[in-house]
Amino acid sequence: MNELTFTYKNWKGEISERRIDVHSINIYYGEVEWHEGEQWLMEAIDLDKNDFRTFAIKDIIGEFSLDFIK
């Protein structure tokens, strides 16, 4: 499976490493319950939680890591 790994700060301020399926990525401008105010969002399957999650692009820390590009 092709995955994208990044460091992310969630709405509670907790920082963790996240892994998502690159084939499930949907990037859009909008607002959702956990990310108030219109902004760029990325929805994707979180491989560790085995469920779709929405990430605020502004809360991604540092660089992305793609497992299939080495």
Regions found by a protein language model. Give the residues of each.
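Core beta-strand-centered patch of the WYL/Sm-like small regulatory domain
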Residues: 1-70
